[in-house]
């Protein structure tokens, strides 16, 4: 485990934990048994980045554009895994956007799948 000092991110703690829990659960659910899950954070002085990534089961390119759509379910589930509702990533993105952030799938040379949460260090405006 590596740690580094990060500035405090002004976000709704329970909402952020819910999103992180969803992303971690998806990494377990869609990854392979021999895969690895990474959770990393960094900042660029104005924004905080939190990556939840896993190895072992890449998302097909044609599904990456639809992955945040409500009710969309990926085709790459682990054999025998219980199917979800297809709402988790859509709700997670909405939650992050309520905190003036973004949730996207990004490329990462160390992982097959990487979801990145990007949040401002200072809120642009108060949550509605």
Regions found by a protein language model. Give the residues of each.
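Short beta-strand/loop element within the Bergerat-fold HATPase_c
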Residues: 34-46
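Short conserved segment of the HATPase_c
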Residues: 59-71
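Short, small-residue-biased leader/transition segments that mark boundaries at the very start
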Residues: 1-6
């Amino acid at each position: 485990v590596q740690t580094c000092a990060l500035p405090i991110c002004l976000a709704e703690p329970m909402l952020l934990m819910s999103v992180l829990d969803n992303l971690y659960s998806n990494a377990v659910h869609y990854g392979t048994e021999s895969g690895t899950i990474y959770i990393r954070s960094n900042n660029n002085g104005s924004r905080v980045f939190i990556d939840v990534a896993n190895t072992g089961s890449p998302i097909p390119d044609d599904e990456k554009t639809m992955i945040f759509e409500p009710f969309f379910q990926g085709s790459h589930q682990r054999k025998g895994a219980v199917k979800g509702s297809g709402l988790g990533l859509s709700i997670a993105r909405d939650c992050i956007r309520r905190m003036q952030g973004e949730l996207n799938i990004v490329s990462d040379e160390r992982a097959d799948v990487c979801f990145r949460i990007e949040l401002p260090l200072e809120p642009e405006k108060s949550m509605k």
